[in-house]
């Protein structure tokens, strides 16, 4: 559902689609799950390499699809740390991609 909302955002340029009742729960669940995994990775409870071996691509795709709404929420809440663990995890996924698959693009 996150990707469907993102596709509609790209078509219309209207970022309120992420807060539409039809998508909001799924968007929130997805970004919260990645933020929680990011916290587990950051604290060494989940291996970074093990996680990224399996999930690097979906992590990057999800970050790219949700970055606009995360940034909007950071601004509206005046809280730059909102979903920071997800952002760091996505940054790690990008580094992983560049190292393991230099010619790949998400």
Predicted regions: what is each one?
Residues 1-106:
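Amphipathic alpha-helical "stem/stalk" segments
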């Amino acid at each position: 559902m996150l990707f469907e909302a993102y596709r509609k955002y790209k078509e219309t340029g209207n970022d309120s689609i992420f807060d539409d009742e039809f998508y909001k729960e799924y968007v929130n669940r997805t970004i919260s799950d990645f933020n929680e995994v990011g916290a587990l990775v950051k604290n060494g409870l989940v291996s970074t390499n093990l996680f990224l071996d399996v999930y690097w691509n979906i992590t990057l795709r999800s970050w790219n699809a949700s970055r606009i709404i995360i940034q909007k929420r950071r601004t509206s809440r005046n809280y730059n740390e909102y979903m920071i663990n997800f952002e760091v995890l996505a940054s790690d996924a990008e580094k992983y991609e560049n190292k393991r698959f230099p010619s790949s693009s998400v």
